[in-house]
């Protein structure tokens, strides 16, 4: 049921994908409040139907409480590993799985459009911008709990991965869009650290550079070309990835 942006790397650019996938994600989703499922989405069996009466003030408070830095328990039917085995595999084999809460950041959680009231449940269209590793299904589930009911996800579309939006993508079966260069890709998702030819050569030889930059991950450009991705800690570099060649 999920659609939207999927960033694919070709050749040596595949080594950069982890920096892209670690970027915040933006989604458009539909949440059905008043009904819960085994998987927290529409693909699972309905497990409860307590219903929910439209309450805009209560909804606003619940959404606000789930925005910012929160602790989230991933959906049990997920790819999270428990003692080396995916949680969804344990659930499907009949095990009861309890996953630990993990910190995530919800930068944006907004209800868009008008609610659709159908019987004893309400469908809400929402926009979510969240840190990598966030389960929007779990966010829907937790919204239901905060509203004193249950909820699950009925539609999900990823509209952006970091700065890469759905408008830059091609649908499967269509002519693909122009390939984005590795330099352009990493420069859009990471801050740039420009160094001289001599410093670039030192990095290639495995030397540590002392730089005037804050802690974080940077793409190193030498004469406008990406050479490496480095982590900077206390002004010192550590190579994460080198460009080929």
Please annotate each region the language model reported.
Residues 3-5, 23, 63, 145-245:
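Accessory RNA 3′-end/elbow-binding domains used by RNA modification enzymes
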């Amino acid at each position: 049921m999920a659609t939207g942006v999927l960033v694919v790397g070709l050749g040596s650019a595949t080594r950069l994908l982890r920096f892209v996938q670690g970027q915040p994600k933006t989604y458009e989703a539909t949440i059905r409040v008043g009904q819960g499922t085994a998987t927290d989405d529409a693909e699972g069996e309905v497990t409860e139907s307590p219903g929910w009466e439209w309450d805009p003030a209560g909804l606003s408070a619940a959404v606000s409480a789930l925005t910012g830095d929160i602790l989230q328990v991933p959906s049990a039917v997920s790819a999270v590993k428990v003692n080396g085995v995916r949680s969804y595999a344990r659930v499907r084999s009949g095990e009861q799985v309890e996953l630990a809460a993990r910190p995530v950041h919800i930068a944006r959680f907004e209800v868009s459009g008008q609610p659709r009231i159908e019987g004893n449940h309400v469908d809400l269209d929402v926009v979510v911008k969240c840190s990598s590793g966030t389960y929007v299904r779990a966010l829907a589930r937790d919204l239901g709990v905060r509203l004193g009911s249950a909820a699950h996800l009925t539609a999900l579309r990823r509209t952006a991965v970091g700065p890469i939006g759905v408008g830059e993508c091609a649908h499967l079966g269509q002519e693909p869009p122009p390939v984005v260069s590795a330099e352009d890709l990493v420069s859009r998702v990471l801050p740039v650290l420009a160094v001289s030819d001599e410093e670039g050569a030192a990095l290639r030889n495995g030397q540590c550079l002392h730089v005037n930059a804050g802690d974080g991950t940077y793409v190193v450009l030498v004469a406008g070309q990406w050479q490496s991705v480095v982590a900077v800690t206390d002004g010192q570099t550590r190579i994460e990835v080198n460009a080929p060649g």
